[in-house]
């Protein structure tokens, strides 16, 4: 199970790192980059998101108490549909955003059930996003300005991975 989480983490870091390197800045969100890709790239992005999500499934369903399995299933389902949405509709759309938000909410409910201390990572979100207001001309302030969705997605992902790896 740990191997699956490590592979998922490597794939997520490689994709995000490549996107940051390609654009020379943080993306607006993890999925924002898919809309700049050609059609074949959208298929690749969907396969990437599905792979990262499916590699999390066995450890997630093994770790979460049986009574709450439906919440984990809702999280995984929302992630899968979020990955497929760019193929269904070519442009940014409300369904994609709603599914992403719902996946984030379900992921944090799962984290609260598995190991609630990982929800403390949201303090990191407040610190990072607060830097935009405290030092807007500072290096961190300039880097994250307008990137709140990406930072929130990163915190969701880190809390899920942390709760699964260290449980």
Stretches with model-predicted labels:
Residues 115-167:
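Terminal transmembrane helical module of multi-pass membrane proteins
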Residues 13-22, 81-87, 129-135:
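Transmembrane alpha-helical segments that form the membrane-embedded catalytic/substrate-channel core
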Residues 34-38, 61-68, 89-95, 137-148:
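Membrane-interface helix-boundary motifs at transmembrane edges
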Residues 9-17, 46-57, 105-115, 126-128, ...:
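Hydrophobic cores of alpha-helical transmembrane segments in multi-pass inner/ER membrane proteins
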Residues 1-65:
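N-terminal topogenic module of multi-pass integral membrane proteins
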Residues 69-125:
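Membrane-proximal helix-loop-helix units in multi-pass membrane proteins
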Residues 4-7, 45-53, 68-74, 96-103, ...:
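Physicochemical signature of membrane-embedded alpha-helices that form the seven-helix bundle of GPCRs
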Residues 1-5, 57-70, 109-121, 165-167:
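Helix-coil boundary and interhelical linker segments in multi-pass alpha-helical membrane proteins
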């Amino acid at each position: 199970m740990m191997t699956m989480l490590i592979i998922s983490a490597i794939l997520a870091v490689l994709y995000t790192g490549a996107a940051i390197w390609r654009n020379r800045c943080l993306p607006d969100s993890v999925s924002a980059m898919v809309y700049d890709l050609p059609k074949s790239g959208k298929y690749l992005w969907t396969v990437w998101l599905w792979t990262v999500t499916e590699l999390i499934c066995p450890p997630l369903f093994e770790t979460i108490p049986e009574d709450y399995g439906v919440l984990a299933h809702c999280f995984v389902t929302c992630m899968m549909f979020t990955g497929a949405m760019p193929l269904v509709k070519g442009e940014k759309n409300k369904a994609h955003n709603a599914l992403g938000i719902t996946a984030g909410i379900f992921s944090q409910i799962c984290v609260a059930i598995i190991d609630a201390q990982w929800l403390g990572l949201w303090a990191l979100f407040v610190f990072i996003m607060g830097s935009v207001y405290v030092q807007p001309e500072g290096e961190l302030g300039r880097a994250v300005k307008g990137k709140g969705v990406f930072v929130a997605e990163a915190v969701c992902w880190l809390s899920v991975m942390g709760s699964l790896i260290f449980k």
